[in-house]
């Protein structure tokens, strides 16, 4: 589903670019242009509720809608489910008081993770290419969670506002472009509009970084993970920076600068904790295999990579073979994929990754009814499991059972109402089952979550005209139309 960027927040990335282009005209002109273009509210001084937890929550959700409209996100329920579970595991051991977390996974090969006020945590899938273990990945996530728990954004803006007036439009624009085009570009947008190139509003200060390092490591340890993973991951990041030209330094390192001293401090801090054995996590290695497939130029390239790993040395032979199964499936080579899967599946028949891989092979072989039966049995063991549910709906749809797939996804949407991919798939199966009113409603939810409020309003209006003598449905549609109006008003009265 395509849509134009019409809502105010969905244009933030364009405005950030505008800020860069007009910087030579003077920072005050840039700030004025951004504010007028966005029609963002005057938030008052730093003593107002703009820094309350609830304000940050609303700001973060508005930002997320904008962000989704401008980046390519990963549509992989297995990977998302894994990262979401890991994030919540860390959050449960953190100092974060408001635990309403929203995760976004960006399809980008670079090293990057970011946290946005209000509990939005973003991860580039490329980060898993660099993190060799789950603990190393968790190091980065725990660091970002620490920035949230210590409210470094609000504290930074408080300080910045005491030096010069803050323009929220420029801050949000910089946040969008910093998480997409790179840290320097985002900071340039912010700095130009604030006339404070020397005081980057969103670049974490050294004291904030040290605080996030310390608190993040404590979160890591409290979650039962390896503190030595932190210096190992930071060292790997620093090494990647040394062999990279200045303009290609990963985004995370632009906004979270590393040094030998900082790594040494992290290593010394890790030594203060008792040593323990931390075995590698197979599930993480399986997720890395999925990411390698996602980022490969072609399925055949992935096939060759995994065959090479199996012929040489691999951190996890089982994960490498699983990656080969996925690559062969993507290449349409079902028989070869099935043989490779059989060699690793026998010892763990209930592992969800393998159950779904088997179902995908069945679907590729044009046996969707068999896939649906297997997935239904597995769902009885783990009711509501998101990756299994999404694959089950896919198998049902391929088996000409769109009406049942609609029922399955409708129930799942009640559990995960903020999942854009789920609403997209639900709209597709509703179209196939002939539920046109439902199709428009689901498309509206998809557009709302992606920041396209005008498109969402159109879809709801289409649905409203089709409803005949159904008061409950009419009432639900009217309520969502009112919600869209409220979202627009919120932009002007935060």
Which residues does each PLM region occupy?
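Extracytoplasmic and endomembrane cell-envelope/extracellular-matrix remodeling and assembly machinery
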Residues: 32, 43-50, 61, 73, ...
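Short pre-active-site segment immediately N-terminal to the catalytic Zn-binding motif
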Residues: 125-139, 202, 207
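Surface-exposed patches in mature extracellular/periplasmic domains of secreted proteins
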Residues: 70-80, 93-103, 157-160, 185-188, ...
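Hydrophobic or amphipathic, alpha-helical segments that drive membrane association/targeting
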Residues: 2-9, 16-114, 198, 242, ...
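Catalytic Zn2+-binding segment of zinc metalloproteases
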Residues: 135, 145-162, 180
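Membrane-active amphipathic alpha-helices enriched in small hydrophobic residues
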Residues: 165-181, 188-200
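Active-site recognition of the HExxH zinc-binding catalytic motif
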Residues: 123, 139-147, 151, 212
